[in-house]
From Swiss-Prot:
The gene is rlmI. SMART domains: PUA (SM00359). One of its GO terms (cellular component) is cytoplasm. It comes from Shigella boydii serotype 18 (strain CDC 3083-94 / BS512). NCBIfam families: PRK15128.1 (NF011707). This is Ribosomal RNA large subunit methyltransferase I. Its EC number is 2.1.1.191. It is an enzyme of class 2 (transferase). Specifically methylates the cytosine at position 1962 (m5C1962) of 23S rRNA. It is found in: Cytoplasm. InterPro entries: PUA, PUA-like_sf, PUA_sf, RLMI, RlmI-like_PUA, SAM-dep_methyl-trfase, SAM-dependent_MTases_sf. Pfam families: Methyltrans_SAM, PUA_3. Residues 2-81 form the PUA domain. One of its GO terms (molecular function) is rRNA (cytosine) methyltransferase activity.
Length: 396
């Protein structure tokens, strides 16, 4: 008999709506014993089968659902089916947009909770973020090797969230050849260098692909400030869009060095690109005090909020930084501002920008809205999958 997680009476509603998480507060008891990440059956208080998922005793998310089909086993064949299903959409997208790199698996939205897989050319970069994903590592890797024999697999499960589920961080080659220090990829006509082994996340922010492209429509003959620039994707896109100057700001000199290489790789005018190592909050205040002005500002900060207790502080941070940006824009200037914090809703983010505009003493029009690129889908039953949101704002 399988191990069963029994829900308290009336706590099955989210599973009946096919939400993939079971929170600890909904659980009545366990029947049997399961190890960290092991597959268990989830039943209601009367014993009716609801789902099959991965058990995580140390997490507030006590189980993550693999399947709502009682006949489906969690094995190599299961992962092969999920991968093939996800690949169909990415194949179409890659052909339409001329991509050689994309998110192959977007966790829960692709039916594989806690699993992120990005493809960069012939390298698959793996992040296993949950106990269940780690427990199924061997089956997943086996499925990947069969479906993608041409690809090397590199593990970037070096993320702090693993510690919340009692797991160590892991990093290194799984199969195949080691990725080069900087791997060139192509995106909307740009060549960009990706540091798979040591870069942020899996090496590059694929989710901002379409936002980088959208930037080009606003920048012709404009002076652009690119905040939290990382390796310069927005800067390269701005130069391709015909900007007169782009200033990229980041705290990492290594990232700025790669940004410079990316400009050179695309044979763009390096004299129009400036790279500044500094704290963005501090530099924006310095620019304001000096009377500096820009026509377009890209504001793409890292995640400010990890949990609900940090949300109010994050709101203040987002408001302050957007207020400073609005103050630096010429009349008719464009602010492209983003939040990658999952707990920050689009409505709340829009209100924060409106409040920032009031504090800056400027009127702002919302003219365009952004979200993560189409290879980062959001399944309808898991709205939490929509984590990246952004706005193009015209400052009056």
């Amino acid at each position: 008999m399988s191990v069963r997680l029994v829900l308290a009476k009336g706590r099955e509603k989210s599973l009946l709506r096919r939400h993939p998480w079971v929170f600890s507060g909904t659980v009545a008891r366990m029947e049997g014993k399961a190890s960290l990440g092991e597959t268990i059956d989830i039943v209601d208080h009367q014993g009716k089968w609801l789902a099959r998922g991965a058990y995580s005793p140390a997490s507030q998310i006590r189980a993550r659902v693999w399947t709502f089909d009682p006949s489906e086993s969690i094995d190599i064949a299961f992962f092969s089916r999920r991968l093939q299903q996800a690949q169909k959409w990415r194949d179409w997208l890659a052909q339409k947009d001329g991509l050689d790199s994309y998110r192959l698996i977007a966790g829960e939205s692709d039916g594989l909770p806690g699993i992120t897989i990005d493809r960069f050319g012939n390298f698959l970069v793996l992040q296993l973020l949950s106990a269940g994903a780690e427990y199924q590592r061997a089956a997943l890797v086996s499925a990947l090797q069969t479906l993608y024999p041409e690809c090397a697999i590199y593990d970037r499960s070096d993320v702090a969230v693993r510690k919340k589920e009692g797991m160590e961080l892991t990093l290194g080659l799984v199969t195949g050849e080691l990725p080069p220090a900087l791997l060139p990829i192509e995106e909307h006509g740009m060549k960009l260098l990706v540091d798979i082994q040591h870069g942020h996340k899996t090496g590059y922010y694929l989710d901002q692909r379409d936002s980088r492209l959208a930037t080009r429509r606003y920048v012709e003959n404009k002076r652009v400030l690119n905040c939290f620039s990382y390796t310069g994707g927005f800067a390269v896109s701005a130069l391709m869009g015909g900007c007169s100057q782009v200033v990229s700001v980041d705290t990492s000199q290594e990232a700025l060095d790669i940004a410079r290489q990316n400009v050179e790789l695309n044979k763009l005018d390096l004299s129009k690109a400036e790279f500044v190592r500094d704290d963005v909050f501090k530099l924006l205040r310095t620019y304001r005090d000096r009377g500096e002005k820009f026509d377009v500002i890209v504001m793409d900060p890292p995640k400010f909020v990890e949990n609900k207790s940090q949300l109010m502080g994050a709101c203040r941070g987002y408001k302050d930084i957007n207020m400073l940006a609005i103050q630096l824009l010429n009349e008719g200037g464009i602010l492209l501002t983003f939040s990658c914090s999952g707990l920050m809703t689009s409505d709340l983010f829009q209100k924060i920008i409106a409040d920032a505009a009031i504090d800056a003493g400027r009127d702002v029009q919302f003219i365009e809205q952004f979200r993560q690129a189409a290879d980062h889908p959001v399944i309808a039953t898991y709205p939490e999958g929509l984590y990246l949101k952004g706005f193009a704002c015209r400052v009056m």
